């Protein structure tokens, strides 16, 4: 139950560009490398970009078990506050559990962002093991094999842990109902990108988010050629270009 020594893709990324800031949030138990190509695209578009490494990630899965959803929320909150102080407009983007954190930020700090971009966000699960076994399993085993690299494109390797840290995963499962209950507080314009085939997050999550937020402006884009880690898959370029178009749209007139 070991993971390889972290290498490229496991460190935070920061770039100071223009007056529009973009916060990118990776998933669980992933790493910034899953969003690095997206970050590079945003840099070329002229934006200020922050892509933090969430606590307990990018090292060993054992470290993740010493952290919680609240710790990760604290990290991205600090990044949001830093961008808000530096930039005239901020857009927050997240993949998978990074989308969960994005939604939580939108619930807590609605005035701090001009829009949000979600790629395969999670707010619940239909899996019975996550619902009923995690509360007990966290006292029995430290980790179990996870689905890493759910990518349709061959020979693409996602940076992240091959094992799911159970205690950390339990805190995610506890956060889901909190985030979902407060989805009506989300009013920011939203770009929702979701894979039609996803072996990690059930597609119903995207429908729940779309139906339960209060955002008046929602752009819904299916990703028919990609699996869960769509930012590294066949539809990556669609994500990158559509996010820039969305950011331009929601920040026009604010600069």
Model-derived regions: residue spans:
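Conserved alpha/beta-hydrolase
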Residues: 43-61
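Gly/Ala-rich beta-loop-alpha elbow adjacent to hydrolase catalytic centers
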Residues: 94-98, 102
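Catalytic histidine neighborhood in serine/cysteine hydrolases
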Residues: 50, 207, 211-229
């Amino acid at each position: 139950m070991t993971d390889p020594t972290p290498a490229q893709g496991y460190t935070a990324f920061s770039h100071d560009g223009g007056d529009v800031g973009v916060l990118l949030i990776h998933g669980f138990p992933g790493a910034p490398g899953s969003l690095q190509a997206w970050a590079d695209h945003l840099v070329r578009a002229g934006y200020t970009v922050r892509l933090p490494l969430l606590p307990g990630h990018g090292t060993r899965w054992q470290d993740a078990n010493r952290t919680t959803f609240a710790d990760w929320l604290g990290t991205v909150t600090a990044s949001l506050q830093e961008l808000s102080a530096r930039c005239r407009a901020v857009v927050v983007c997240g993949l998978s559990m990074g989308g969960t954190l994005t939604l939580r930020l939108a619930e807590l700090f609605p005035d701090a962002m001009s829009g949000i971009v979600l790629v395969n966000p999670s707010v619940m699960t239909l899996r019975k093991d996550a619902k009923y076994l995690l509360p007990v399993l966290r006292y029995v085993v430290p980790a179990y094999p996870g689905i890493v690299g759910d990518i349709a494109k061959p020979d693409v390797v996602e940076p992240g842990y091959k094992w799911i840290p159970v205690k950390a995963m339990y805190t995610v499962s506890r956060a889901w109902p909190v985030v979902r209950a407060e989805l009506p507080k989300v009013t920011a314009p939203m770009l929702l990108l979701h894979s039609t085939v996803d072996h990690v997050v059930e597609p119903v999550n995207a429908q729940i988010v779309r139906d339960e937020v209060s955002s008046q402006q929602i752009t819904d884009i299916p990703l028919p050629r990609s699996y869960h880690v769509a930012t590294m898959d066949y539809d990556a370029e669609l994500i990158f270009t559509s996010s820039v178009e969305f950011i331009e749209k929601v920040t026009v007139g604010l600069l």
